[in-house]
Amino acid sequence: MRTLSSSDLLGLWERGGNLHVLDRGLLALSAAMPEASAAGLADWPLGQRNKALLDLHCSVFGPALEGWTACANCGEKMEFKLNGRDLADAHDHAIHAEQIVLFKGQSFRLPTSRDLAEGARHPDAETAARAVVERCRTGEKTTADWNAEDLEGLGNALAAADPLAEMRIALCCPGCGRESEETIEMISFLWAEIEARAKRLFWEVHALARAYGWAESEILSLSPARRALYAGMVQA
């Protein structure tokens, strides 16, 4: 995996602005891993994809994952800060697309981005979950008669086999003390960083081009430290 330059980040933000969140994740990985095909990345198990997104975040933006969510009980802000490198290293074992999970006498492969994209076509969560399950089923039996508890049980079995497929953290509300589990959507997390960095870069290009008459390529070729120093001098 290669790191992404300032020009890469601007290009990503521009190309991915109107894409579905799943496609944004694959676009970012394609930029960082040009040797991998887009189709191949779409068929990676979700944990493998999220691990790569974590590695990319650490490479470009550093290991700190900071955010917040509102308490469902009282609305108080619950902040969190994680070390992405520690999280990635804790799940450094290989996840194979061929891995099979057995549940209720049936076998299932691990879900991929392509499976989630198919599920996203459906109007409600349960129908989407059933569509993903059917795509992942490797046997001949159907799961049409499964109830919500069966789907939840399979979801737990798949999560145990691929822990990074759904990244969840435990939080405690500082206001009411309510404990909850929240999901970190790694693609959305990474894309928010890409968008913030891109907008800052656009401002720096605009400011320095006006002040010094430099071309965009010249400005982006500067190191971040030098570019920030020039931008600060322009504002002074």
Question: Which residues are covered by each model-predicted region?
Answer:
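Long C-terminal interaction/binding lobes of large macromolecular proteins
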Residues: M1-A236
